Amino acid sequence: MILSFFALFFALYLAKTLEKKLIYQQVRSKIKRQINFKFHSLPIHYSYCFSIWALLLLILLYLAGVNGFLILFISLVASFIIFFAIYRFRDKFNAKNHLDWLFKKSLLLSATIGILITIAIMMAIFGEAGKFFKIIAWQEFFFGTKWNPQLAMNGGQEVVKSSFGAVPVFLGTLLITLVAMSVAVPIGIMGAVNLSLYCKSSTRDLLKPILEILAGIPTVVYGYFAVIFIAPFFKLFFGLLNIEIASESALSAGFVMGIMIIPFILSLTDDAINSVPRSLYDGALAMGSTNYEMISRVIIPSAMPAIIGSIILAVSRAVGETMIVVMSAGLLAKMTFNPLDSTTTATAQIVSLLSGDQEFSSSKTLASFALALTLFVVTFIFNILALIVIKKYQKKNG
């Protein structure tokens, strides 16, 4: 610890010495060029500040029981940084350019890290999915109509390779997503229109934060809501109509998922509508348009790119949802498009396949990566198509 303090005081000494040298150089430059030059802040000021913060860090490390050699290393690094920083305070030093360079490099580093993480995820998914397709033919996976990986294992031996047909899983994912979007999209868009154009500002300021808070509720809470309230309600309602409905149905899961998604669409659509220029409102009303004509023919088309973006976000959330499906729709894959039947989704099956003590190299476990790969590709294609649609609307609206 004593050596660490010595390193910091040595840094202060270097800063003070360099400060005197630099001031002398600047005075000479001032005399030669007859200009009024002055430091924005003296180098010793930066060294004092840096040393104080470094000393605080060293004290915290010492109290935390960190090894003394590590503390000494940090002190020496701090001294080097101070020395380098003070050395860079030259006559022609331009802090603005250096900060701009540092900012650009930071942005480049952040973008590179994001790209590398994405590539790493893709490599992991593609690699493990490739192992799965070496065991199970891709034709069987993408076109098979029987999904029951539990039957494919018997004492660790693969016995039934025809149990990995993923069509029922993808069909269930599509069904629940459609139910959720049929609930969330109309309510979200109409609620945003009402919130933006008809509500008072005080009412809007009260309701919008509440709706945004709903978006942060854990999905397991929505799952309990579906199991305890929505599923029994649908059971009672359809029972009065003499219509049979499963206790774990795609309708209850999709309905609750739609409720969960409403705040996303409503909040983003509200922001999009408020970003439409006021001149378009006034121009439409001046031409004799009714409120309905103004909203349907002027406001909504102008905000359509952002609305499509909110719908894309909602679809991605619906496709990736797991807990609501596991709790209220079950894990049984069926070849059905009836929302009153029980079904499952790809994400729920991924959780099911990765749960337990089975070997990582088994086809049952590797099947989860095949499902993940399919979801990744489908979502990627969907986002590309959505970007094309957004550009089309942007060109159409000028």
Where are these regions (language model features)?
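Interfacial/capping segments of alpha-helical transmembrane domains
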Residues: 23-28, 64-66, 115, 119-146
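Transmembrane alpha-helices
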Residues: 209, 214, 268, 273, ...
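C-terminal transmembrane helix and the adjacent membrane-cytosol boundary/short C-terminal tail
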Residues: 271-274, 278, 285, 312, ...
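Membrane-interfacial helix termini and adjacent extracytoplasmic/periplasmic loops
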Residues: 127-167, 222-259, 329
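Transmembrane alpha-helix signature in integral membrane proteins
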Residues: 68-84, 164-194
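Interhelical loop and adjacent transmembrane-helix boundary motif
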Residues: 325-376
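Membrane-cytosol interface at the C-terminal ends of specific transmembrane alpha-helices
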Residues: 181-185, 189-194, 198-201, 205, ...
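Transmembrane-helix boundary motif in ABC transporter permease subunits
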Residues: 88-97, 179-211, 224, 386-394
